[in-house]
């Protein structure tokens, strides 16, 4: 049996992973040309280390979120689990060896016991989430939203109980900070973790059952799959992976601040999973795609930091939101799940000036401190976006959308 080379090439190029690699290359090349400091050219090593390090930290708990999404769930509590785990880890260190903690010399066995205790707390959180969903019958969104709020409150109360009404726990160094600076070692550990999850999700019965449950839970139940146990496994994997990140963050930063630590990280994890090809409806997604989604997201954020400069971190949430919207749009249009025109209704036409105005305002926010910036640039950019969207709406109104993002067809004339 021979394989048509053209068909094989189309199949390879249509994969999410290849598309992400191409998109990542485009972002890197664009950053090289737009970065006024030419950081990628002057300091390629340090820049690559920073991006890889941030990708690894995001990747650990994003992979856990991906498993949950593939199984048909959602987890809004991963950021709170990170904060709680850092708090539990630091509290165990302080309670087990108070003298060593004050002196800044924690014994190895104390660290090991604290790590095990923290990971067990992650198992408990995953079990709680699974019970709220399977036992109580709450939707995953509501169940994990409740634990997200509750865990941060619990972490604040735990710190006050352990420290005597302080709001954070500080520790100079656990001896791991230098190891965490070795990006190669950290990346290898992450790839091993990702490889294990890839094997489980793609080469085992459990992984196939998780995909099947995410695709159609009722059909999975009728086929004899124990969906409740699978949900427990998925949420435990998600919570334990977040607990690992909480331990690493405390070891790296030397401080547990549940009020601010990892706030909003759950959205980044979901964003990376969606960018990597995971469908929020469940049943679709890969571990390699999620890894590349993390790399792409962190590269985009790093590119914005370099191009915009001072204060770019303020716009990180906006960038993540835009990237997620584009990723989901391309995914749904490319798969043919949605063929409705973007601007085929009155609401769509009304949104065109809104998007043009937002584009102009975003231009002002990003580039207002640049020497070349004038208000005329922002107005022209907003008008350009407005013209492009209006043209797109006009094409849709004349032809109608068949499928895909820009694939159109002419509607046949109606018979009177």
Model-derived segments and their meaning:
Residues 242, 253, 257-324:
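Transmembrane alpha-helical segments in multi-pass inner-membrane proteins
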Residues 31-34, 44-101, 131-138, 270-288, ...:
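Single transmembrane alpha-helix segments in multi-pass membrane proteins
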Residues 99-148, 195, 292-297:
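Alpha-helical transmembrane segments within multi-pass membrane transporters and channels
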Residues 1-29, 195, 222-229, 300-416:
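Cytosolic-side transmembrane-helix boundaries in multi-pass membrane proteins
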Residues 31, 177-213, 226, 241-245, ...:
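Alpha-helical transmembrane segments of multi-pass integral membrane proteins
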Residues 112, 140-203, 232, 252-262, ...:
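Transmembrane helix-bundle core of multi-pass membrane transporters
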Residues 4-56, 208, 247, 251-259, ...:
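Helix-loop-helix hairpins and the membrane-proximal interhelical loops
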Residues 217-221, 225-237, 288:
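Amphipathic cytosolic juxtamembrane alpha-helices at the membrane-cytosol interface
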């Amino acid at each position: 049996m021979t394989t048509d080379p053209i068909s094989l090439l189309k199949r390879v190029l249509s994969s999410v992973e290849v598309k992400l690699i191409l998109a990542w290359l485009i972002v890197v090349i664009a950053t090289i040309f737009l970065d006024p400091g030419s950081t990628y050219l002057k300091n390629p090593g340090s820049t690559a280390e920073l991006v890889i390090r941030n990708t690894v930290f995001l990747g650990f708990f994003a992979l856990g979120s991906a498993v949950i999404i593939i199984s048909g769930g959602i987890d809004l509590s991963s950021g709170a689990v990170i904060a709680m785990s850092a708090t539990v880890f630091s509290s165990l260190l302080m309670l087990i060896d108070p003298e060593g903690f004050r002196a800044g010399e924690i014994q190895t066995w104390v660290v090991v016991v604290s790590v095990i205790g923290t990971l067990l707390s992650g198992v408990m959180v995953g079990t709680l989430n699974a019970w709220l969903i399977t036992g109580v019958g709450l939707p995953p969104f509501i169940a994990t939203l409740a634990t997200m709020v509750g865990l941060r409150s619990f972490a604040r109360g735990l710190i006050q109980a352990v420290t005597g009404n302080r709001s954070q726990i500080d520790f100079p160094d656990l001896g791991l900070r230098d190891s965490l600076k070795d990006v190669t070692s950290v990346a290898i550990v992450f790839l091993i973790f990702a490889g294990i999850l890839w094997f489980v999700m793609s080469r085992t019965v459990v992984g196939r059952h998780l995909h099947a449950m995410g695709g159609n839970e009722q059909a999975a139940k009728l086929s004899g799959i124990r969906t409740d146990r699978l949900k427990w496994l998925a949420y435990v994997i998600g919570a334990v992976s977040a607990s690992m990140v909480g331990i690493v963050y405390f070891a790296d930063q030397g401080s547990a601040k549940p009020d601010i630590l990892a706030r909003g990280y759950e959205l980044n994890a979901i964003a990376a999973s969606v960018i990597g090809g995971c469908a929020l409806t469940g049943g679709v997604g890969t571990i390699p795609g999620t890894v590349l989604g993390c790399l792409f997201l962190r590269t985009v954020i790093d590119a914005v930091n370099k191009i915009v400069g001072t204060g770019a971190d303020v716009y990180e949430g906006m960038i993540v939101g835009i990237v997620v919207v584009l990723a989901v749009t391309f995914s749904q249009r490319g798969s043919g799940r949605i063929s409705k025109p973007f601007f085929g209704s009155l609401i769509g036409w009304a949104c065109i000036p809104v998007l043009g105005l937002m584009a102009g305002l975003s231009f002002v926010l990003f580039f207002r401190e640049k020497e070349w910036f004038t208000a005329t640039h922002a107005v022209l950019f907003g008008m350009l976006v407005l013209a492009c969207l209006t043209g797109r709406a006009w094409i849709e109104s004349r032809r109608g959308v068949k499928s895909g993002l820009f694939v159109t067809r002419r509607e046949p004339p109606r018979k009177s």
